[in-house]
Amino acid sequence: MLSNFLEIFLLISPVFILIILGNLLRRIGVPELSFWHVSDKLIYWVLIPALLFHHVSQITLSSTMLANYAVVILSGLFVVTTLSFIAGKLFGYTPQIWTSVMQGSARHNAFIALAIAGSLFGNKGLALGAIFMVILIPVINIVIVSTMTSTLNQEVGNNSRPSIFDVLFELIKNPFILAIATGLVISFVGAERIIIIHETTGLLGSAALPIMLLSIGANIKIREISLTITPIIIASVLKLLVFPIVVFFVAKSMNLSLFETTIAVIFAAVPTAASSYSLAKQFGAETQLMTSIITIQVALSFITIPIILAFLAT
């Protein structure tokens, strides 16, 4: 298993090197801070949607396969969300704290997952990874926002609190969802490869992940780490260990291939989404704790992801 760990660690290490490099670049001010804000918009509206459309539109997929993938990944989501709620009750956490723990346990950094899937499996890894994205993004957002809406008594007025309808409307406009949905339509109808469109989106998509990983690193704020240890440990154990373990056993019980299982486990094993901070701030949850969970999970995942994938390889 040690040899598998080292081999996988070396294969996916460029992903984490780019994250570290992004953080170092922000610290020394090269490029200027304004660059990261502009690049985030470029990534969100152009590069990642192009990447997702390019790969999803060329994948062969049936509705049965899609249903199986949904059962596998959503089983893990259900377990960790439930356990985070139970942990919040057992430890007597305020809604502000346990909703941050829940976000840290349930949400996923899809960009790190896509980068790892691409490093290990190339284009077919990116294509299947995009399918798991389209399953997870709507469900996670609806579950998280509905829970936070019903449990958090925050000081801001109701007008500034997103409702479920706001979330659904944002999901409909989400460029990732639109790109994947368009790609799925083309895939299901069996349309021919459109050379101009696919070559263009392929070129744009090739720039997406490197810039995205640098941006993830640039947005990590180590100085803002909280000293509230127990909630961080709970969220990290649930996200980095429990989530992928549950997904692995469900995938095995449903006879998914090793490739399909590995992609599902990668999405389960990556750290929580950086956007969790924005949602915590909107709802008046514990933002410093959320920042700490995000930062520490990224650091821990450097080790936990290769270990989990090495276990799969054996």
Enumerate the language-model features and the residues they cover.
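Alpha-helical transmembrane segments of multi-pass small-molecule/ion transporters
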Residues: 1-314
